[in-house]
Amino acid sequence: MARKIICFGPGPQFKGGIANYNTALAKVLDSKEGVEVFLISWTQQYPAIVPREFIDKKSKLDFLEGTNVKVTYITNYNRPKTWNETFRLIKEINPEMVIFQWYNAHQGIPLHKIAKKIKKHTSIEIVFDLHFVVPKENSSVDKKLTKRGLRIADSYIVHANKTANELKEIFPNQPFFLTENGTRTAEKNQKTIIKLYHPIYTIFEPKNDFDVEAFKRKHNLEKYVFLYFGFIRKYKGLHHAIEAFAKLTEKRDDVSFL
């Protein structure tokens, strides 16, 4: 009988690193023999007051092509009714575990509700894959939502010792068991922290016919190119990179910043 695993987080129709990560995780798990993978996704990830469009309308790639991953878009941040629908779907699938992607403190509200129902009505393992613990903006509201959202979990995945230490700081009275091989603690009062290196994505492949020099000529780029890729947010440090690059251009004329 196949092991069932649910990857909860933004599906492949969304843009952004977390959507890519969750999709890549589902794809890799699907490649394992005897594993049946379900990807349950948001339809809307953030409060309605957030104006940004997160749907990827440009990419024509199907990152899950050729897999058996079953994708369902169901969870709407702004419609609590869908939180209950999400729980019922998870209960119906009855997986061995649900891996929740944790990357925004405000999602602690719906995720807490969903995880709490799973904990109360099933024996499914609840795993939170932590892309951070301490919010970058670090407001008191974010801290409360983070603590509320994460406390239901049975196990946690972290990608740095710093993240594990932050988790211990917000739950100072909770005993933890830290492992790097996925072993779960046998102690009832402990929760497991699984430390894994951040993986290299397998959903992207280089274009063998990509002409690097032609691209540089078209975009007036110099020999050496420094690339910033991703959303522009203060904590990502783009302003520091620009300042550092400005100093570099005082000494060299063969560099570009893209």
Where are these regions (language model features)?
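Short N-terminal targeting/anchoring amphipathic segment
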Residues: 72-76, 86-110, 124-127
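Nucleotide-activated donor-dependent transferases that construct or modify glycoconjugates
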Residues: 2-15, 98, 102
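A structural motif in glycosyltransferase catalytic domains
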Residues: 22, 29, 226, 241-242, ...
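Carbohydrate-associated surface elements
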Residues: 162, 182, 199
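Conserved donor-binding/catalytic core segment of Leloir-type glycosyltransferases
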Residues: 6, 200, 220-236, 242-245
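N-terminal strand-loop element at the rim of the active site
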Residues: 13-15, 27-92, 177-182
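Nucleotide-sugar donor phosphate/pyrophosphate-binding loop at the beta->alpha transition
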Residues: 122-127, 132-152, 159, 165, ...
